[in-house]
């Protein structure tokens, strides 16, 4: 019999299907293996033992995959708020900690909230209700929720965020763009790889936009006389790697954010594709889920349902048409 994905101890229980999941364990049947439901209307658990785990085991699993020394100097990955010796009831994964994601963790009965972006970059001088960060900290403490962040250490880890992006767009022969070793751990910033076959630049950028759900992809005017095959990329804010991408002969460089002046001077070098910070990291949650599922299959893991992108897009086609006419 496969292990069910929740942490509890049961000696012998019989209950009706949906009510059992909801009332005894606090979540729906999607995390209960099919074999436990094959008797139909009734579920019987006989002498079933499922071990409990502490929150520190969740943190340890993430850090085995993405060691904290791999994070950048400015970063604050790791424990943000809460206790680690408490038993883990479940983990909610999100890109950003907001008041809504804290509330969702409470609703789902999860006392672990794992974010990609740290809630705390700088120290707090007080915890009140003055700012959203303070309110998130307060609500997490009140509800016994531990907040943990896996940020640039997850970006820089082998098989991490940038490798997941490369996988999604079909790159082969992927390696770190700027490899390094920190405290004995190997990692790197960005990745570079090759497409199975060359693609027309704008067709490639359109394909990437579709994969990542990008409404407005920004790009430069790159070399029009050649197709793209060698691709460098960095999720999030990656313009610091643009020079390295040029040096390594990339045909295109993809990232989430890029400063205005970086768009200049590369018309003969390579194409630039800027997806948006949030959009470039959209597959980070599935990566974290896979890491935890492999290391801790008993842990209930949920992906946050509320989008946390703070940027809104106002589409004004009449202004776009006017601008295009003025440029002619």
What kind of feature is each model-predicted range?
Residues 25-27, 34-36:
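Low-complexity, intrinsically disordered Ser/Thr/Pro- and acidic-rich segments
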Residues 18-19, 35, 45-46:
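Intrinsic low-complexity/disordered segments
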């Amino acid at each position: 019999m496969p292990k069910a994905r929740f942490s509890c101890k049961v000696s012998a229980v019989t209950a009706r299907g949906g009510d059992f999941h909801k009332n005894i364990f606090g979540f729906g049947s999607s995390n209960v293996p099919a074999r436990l439901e094959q008797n139909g209307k009734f579920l019987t658990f006989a002498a079933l033992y499922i071990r409990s785990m502490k929150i520190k085991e969740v943190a340890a699993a993430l850090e085995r995959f993405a060691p904290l020394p791999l994070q950048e100097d400015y970063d604050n990955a790791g424990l943000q708020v809460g206790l680690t010796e408490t038993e883990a009831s479940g983990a909610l994964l999100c890109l950003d900690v907001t008041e809504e994601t804290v509330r969702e963790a409470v609703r789902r009965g999860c006392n672990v909230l794992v974010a990609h972006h740290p809630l705390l970059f700088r120290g707090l001088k007080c915890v009140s209700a003055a700012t959203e960060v303070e309110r998130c900290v307060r609500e997490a403490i009140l509800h016994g929720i531990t907040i943990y962040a896996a940020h640039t250490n997850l970006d820089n880890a082998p098989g991490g965020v940038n490798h997941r992006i490369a996988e999604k767009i079909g790159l082969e022969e992927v390696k770190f763009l700027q490899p390094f070793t920190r405290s004995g751990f190997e990692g790197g910033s960005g990745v570079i790889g090759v497409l199975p076959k060359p693609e027309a630049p704008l067709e490639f950028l359109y394909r990437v936009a579709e994969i990542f759900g990008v409404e407005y992809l920004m790009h430069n005017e790159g070399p029009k006389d050649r197709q793209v095959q060698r691709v460098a990329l960095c999720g999030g804010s990656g313009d610091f790697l643009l020079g390295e991408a040029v040096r390594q002969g990339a045909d295109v460089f993809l990232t989430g954010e890029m400063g205005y002046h970086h768009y200049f001077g590369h018309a003969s070098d390579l194409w630039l594709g800027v997806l948006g910070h949030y959009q470039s990291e959209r597959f980070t949650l599935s990566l974290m889920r896979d890491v935890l599922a492999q290391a801790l299959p008993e842990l209930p893991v949920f992906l946050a349902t509320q989008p946390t992108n703070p940027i809104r897009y106002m589409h004004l086609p009449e202004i776009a048409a006017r601008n295009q006419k003025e440029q002619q």
